[in-house]
Amino acid sequence: MQEEEGNLEELVYFYPPSTTPPAVGKYTQLISDLLQSVSIVDALPGGAAQAGVLCQDTKEVLERENTVLEIAIPRQDNLVIVGDIHGQFADMLSNVLSIQLNLNNSKATDGRGSPSTEIYKFLFLGDYVDRGPQSLEVITLLFALKVEYPEHIFLLRGNHEEAQTSRLYGFFQECKSKLEGTGDRGPASVDITSSTWLQYNTVFCWLPLAAVVACPSGMFFCTHGGLSPHTLSVPLLKSLRRHEYGMVDDFEDTFYTPTSRGGDDMLEGPGAKARLVIDGLLWSDPEDQLSGCQMNNRGCGFIFGPDVTRSFLDRNYSYGFPPSKRQLIGEMKPGMQFILRGHQCAREGYMWCHGGLVLTLFSAPNYCGMHGNKGAVALLRGQVQAGKDRVELEFNVYDTVVTGGSDNLVACLSPFAFAHYFSGDS
């Protein structure tokens, strides 16, 4: 492992290096700086060029992961599940990542009086960028953590990790204003094919689309949005060519757009059903008073009823978790118990629907500086699950640490995108 140059005593590590060392040591300084709220311009002194190297390293890590992650949480492990962040960097630091950072600073001991080796793994459900003022800080820190701790930090894709969306709702403009023309890049470029924004979006295409989490008390399915009429089984999801969805052409300002945005011919053409499945995973919403699926009024994805959820969970009741990972868990209760997703602002930070079969988690408190909602994360403690018949989650609910109102949103959105906020995607 090659550590970065500098005074190691001044570094803030996300995990204790004695028990969970960084995988490559290339981004320890960057992580330390961002954990201490150093300006992104100072944290990335190489500017756009340095960000591009981080994007390439992250892409190489993600390419080795499956489209559907399989995350085992045995008795000795803990998992923090995180909903939408939307550029609210201060809240992510203070309310989400602080769960592990505070543990690092505690004097906790194990049952024998030795320093505790307890750590938290993290599963993020997507929507890291857009809306909030510090999307670049959020995604840069998460990418660096992913490279250094690939078996502890898991990142799923949200509907805002897609070029057409992030072009409109703030991330594109933020990349240009904060990094273009900095460091070794020289003057800012107007060509989107060479922009920092494009490099981040290339990585977005490789983010996994879903995860199955297994622990002693059972399994549950995680994704950003939800289901579609074609989302039948987890094994089929594994064959999706996720990197082809939402790509930006390398040489032209064109987008491979989601296919469910209207039109009678939306099921025609090769791969159309696969794209509809991905539309659902990223864009769909549950609805209690509905049977089956309907087109979503967001303009993409679907609204799905409790019967669709029950059918999906029943079809995947006997999902075959990999033997090597199941062995880590030991005795495990059977069954796919519920769906955990983000994508919708929840007044109390989380909400159950479909008779307790769908859980929505939202981790951006006072969303856009105007909604007044709580934020929440879910905690899965492996030790607690032992001997239980069903998965039991704990919830950390919190208020924003940011003072002020909607200026936090307007600061990073163009007038065109801001107008879209009130009329389109929510």
Please annotate each region the language model reported.
Residues M1-S426:
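Feature recognizes metal-dependent phosphohydrolase scaffolds
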